[in-house]
UniProtKB/Swiss-Prot annotation:
InterPro entries: DNA_Rcmb_RecR (IPR000093), Rcmb_RecR (IPR023627), Rcmb_RecR_Znf (IPR015967), TOPRIM_dom (IPR006171), TOPRIM_RecR (IPR034137). SUPFAM superfamilies: Recombination protein RecR. The keyword Cell membrane does not apply. It comes from Maricaulis maris (strain MCS10). This is Recombination protein RecR.
Amino acid sequence: MKTASAGPEIERLISLLAKLPGLGPRSARRAALNLLGKKDALMRPLAEALADAADKIRACSECGNMDVSDPCTVCAAPNRLDAAICVVETVGDLWALERAGAFKGRYHVLGGVLSALDGVRPEDLNITKLVERSAREEVSEIVLALNATVDGQTTAHYLADRMAGCNVSITSLARGVPVGGELDYLDDGTLAAAFRSRSTV
């Protein structure tokens, strides 16, 4: 969407901003105008932070997390449990689990999920490294923390089959009622999963 009275530099800025998740042409235009109106307070510091991140941040060669160090701070932490590896789709999922503080083992970022529609195949994901890691002597459990989508569950089944001979326990996150959730507002699939995952009180 071309912006009237905007030069090529502004058009390029808007075009690049529009490529970010959740930003369409209108939102990108508003963001660009906001940045241009706050050059010293926001635009220049943001440009410096982006350049710094582009130069210094890389994917961890062990788990796939994003960090300035390799291995990342999570992999390098001596107090993490080596017996369990939690498999996630994205780095954002890893960060969400870390915020929750519920998992104390190691992580593995796949970099996506299998998808026939999007043409994502096993060789497009970080699966070979996962199989290598799961074969290590100290690993006894692989936790599949993938999204409850068709592609996520297809990927989980593929991984379970692929690692069947690795002599590890393969588990997945429980599905069901979220903390603070009301039954009347939950979808049918979530309610059905909650019943299947019910436990003794």
